[in-house]
Design a protein with these regions (language model features):
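Gly/Ser/Thr-rich active-site loops/lids in small-molecule metabolic enzymes
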Residues: 24-31, 101, 105-134
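Short, small-residue-biased leader/transition segments that mark boundaries at the very start
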Residues: 2-6
Length: 221
């Protein structure tokens, strides 16, 4: 929960145009950092939140000094130059379509765009540079934390999927919510992502099940 609050606060700074950017470490960084720190301390004061930044701030400043040894570039130019030279660019993202800040199951979403178009807005890559879009999905559904989950299983079947699929959080070890595949959500993801090819994973998890169910329609109330 604490990690989520910190991440959300960082995105808030970005949208409010108050965030620190990598390029800032080369120009008046101390002043910009002090101003940002003062803003956040005012927020924490209003929440009556006790904190001690000494150790965290020390480690963070060491990280800033470490970054200074590397050349800084405008990533959008760097990536597009590589693409223009017919080079391959591997971009790493996280989280699925339904956690997208704009098109996911709001408000139970993350703070960024997780759909395919997020690669364009996040990297400065034009939409016409994207060719095939591979949609990767599990043979069943999982979810971490709160939010709608129409096919969630609360019985031993859900526990069995969780155990066989090793569905536990990679960081916290928290058990993931498990359920049957939601084809309505999958069809929606295909639409907003512009998927051209589908790849199903973890189908072997369901090998021992005599019956496999799927959600094929939903009703809004």
């Amino acid at each position: 929960q604490r990690q989520m609050c910190i991440r959300d606060r960082t995105y808030t700074d970005k949208i409010s145009r108050n965030g620190l950017r990598v390029g800032d470490i080369l120009h008046n960084f101390e002043q910009k950092y002090a101003e940002a720190k003062a803003r956040h301390e005012q927020i924490l004061k209003g929440l009556n939140y006790e904190y001690d930044l000494t150790e965290i701030e020390k480690a963070w400043m060491e990280g800033i000094e470490y970054l200074k040894q590397f050349p800084l570039v405008d990533s959008e130019h760097e990536i597009n130059n590589l693409l223009n030279d017919n080079k391959s660019v591997l971009c790493e993202g996280a989280q699925g379509t339904m956690l997208d800040i704009d098109f996911g199951s709001y408000p139970f979403v993350t703070s960024s765009n997780t759909i395919c178009a997020g690669a364009c807005t996040g990297l400065g890559v034009a939409p016409n540079k994207i060719g095939e879009v591979y949609g990767i999905f599990k043979a069943y559904c999982t979810r971490v934390g709160a939010g709608p989950f129409p096919t969630e299983l609360f019985d031993k079947t859900g526990d069995q999927i969780c155990t066989l699929g090793h569905e536990f959080g990679s960081v916290t070890g928290r058990k993931r919510r498990c359920g049957w595949i939601d084809l309505v959500a999958l069809k929606y993801a295909i639409m907003v992502d512009g998927v051209t090819k589908l790849i199903m994973m973890k189908s072997d998890v369901l090998d021992s099940f005599e019956t496999i169910k799927a959600c094929v329609a939903s009703v809004s109330y």
